[in-house]
């Protein structure tokens, strides 16, 4: 049977104290909404419906960027969770499969949990996701009778015996689409806040004689984010899990707690990551590479055996071939570095390609921007670039070419040619002594005046 996702993402998130919609706050460089969508994607949903409210256009853009087939609907007034789900009714018209309701600010659901919810749906009309709370506090309690969920009891209405229950409601559920919307139609708002609560569908389903159950997961999967402190805690949880996964995959993290990973970071086995490395979004590192300390990588690809850093920056579009070397205080942007090529010190390479085996001397700059447009620099194979060379793009250096130290290259250099363009040196005898005497006299004169 096919499955649809309904992800609730309409909340303003007042406690976040932000103009950004709560579900768009990032964990490991990816919006919480995207984490929820990726969690649900394991079910291979036939339809995905995002219910947006506050900041709807920004939410729509983020959702469609992740899944262009998603449908985004608007909850103009926030009248409760049941009302939010009901906004998906039109988008799911004619859909005969199961609906799984997720929350856009609950980013840690695991694939097996969702799969177990759908497995339970085969024998029950309505499935609620619960968790064993370390501190149940004011969560709603799930009162079970065998594998049957009898009712959800809110804390303020629970007896002392019911408050002792540690099995709590997460708010997530799975149900046949037709059944779910029929249950929601029966939900009222006769409560202090005048809202329509999704949890009420359990009582309605029981009264209709439907089979209701609850599936358990660990509490961390249901962690919701409502404040900046919650966001920081959630990010820390993600980082701990992601680091552990890399270690299990055969990646060496020399100081795991200092390495920051993005949600989509991919690192191959036998790669060594030194302390204080930051991975932005869109990074792939192949097996056997080394990322040295204090490097920052984003939107780049590092091939097998390459070495990056220390103190290197790889920006979007950086492509390092096998055994390439990028050293300290080097920045690479939108550039391909060929096999075995070396860019070892104090260099900026932007909008460029460097052929295999080439060596780029310290202080080399690709002058790629004319104030309006970017231009490319093309460096062939086995080229030697002398220290402090300025490469004024657009410019091409052929295979085997060389530049003299301090050269400003403004024209193409033929293969195997030497480019030399610098002012001829003159040594003026005794000029330095006279200049220092003049400058010291000026300094002494100013000091007397003050």
UniProtKB/Swiss-Prot annotation:
It is an enzyme of class 2 (transferase). It catalyses: alpha-D-glucosamine 1-phosphate + acetyl-CoA = N-acetyl-alpha-D-glucosamine 1-phosphate + CoA + H(+); N-acetyl-alpha-D-glucosamine 1-phosphate + UTP + H(+) = UDP-N-acetyl-alpha-D-glucosamine + diphosphate. InterPro entries: Bifunctional_GlmU, GlmU-like, GlmU_C_LbH, Hexapep, MobA-like_NTP_Trfase, Nucleotide-diphossugar_trans, Trimer_LpxA-like_sf. The keyword Transport does not apply. CDD domains: GT2_GlmU_N_bac, LbH_GlmU_C. The keyword Nucleotidyltransferase applies. Residues 1-228 are annotated as: Pyrophosphorylase. The active site is at residue 345. GO terms for cellular component: cytoplasm; membrane. GO terms for molecular function: glucosamine-1-phosphate N-acetyltransferase activity; magnesium ion binding; UDP-N-acetylglucosamine diphosphorylase activity. Residues 250-450 are annotated as: N-acetyltransferase. UDP-N-acetyl-alpha-D-glucosamine binds at residues 8-11, 22, 75, 80-81, 103-105, 140, 154, 169, 226, 315, 333, 348, 359. Pfam families: Hexapep, NTP_transf_3. SUPFAM superfamilies: Nucleotide-diphospho-sugar transferases (SSF53448), Trimeric LpxA-like enzymes (SSF51161). GO terms for biological process: cell morphogenesis; cell wall organization; lipid A biosynthetic process; peptidoglycan biosynthetic process; regulation of cell shape; UDP-N-acetylglucosamine biosynthetic process. Its cofactor is Mg(2+). Homotrimer. Catalyzes the last two sequential reactions in the de novo biosynthetic pathway for UDP-N-acetylglucosamine (UDP-GlcNAc). The C-terminal domain catalyzes the transfer of acetyl group from acetyl coenzyme A to glucosamine-1-phosphate (GlcN-1-P) to produce N-acetylglucosamine-1-phosphate (GlcNAc-1-P), which is converted into UDP-GlcNAc by the transfer of uridine 5-monophosphate (from uridine 5-triphosphate), a reaction catalyzed by the N-terminal domain. In the N-terminal section; belongs to the N-acetylglucosamine-1-phosphate uridyltransferase family. In the C-terminal section; belongs to the transferase hexapeptide repeat family. This is Bifunctional protein GlmU. It comes from Ruegeria pomeroyi (strain ATCC 700808 / DSM 15171 / DSS-3) (Silicibacter pomeroyi). The gene is glmU.
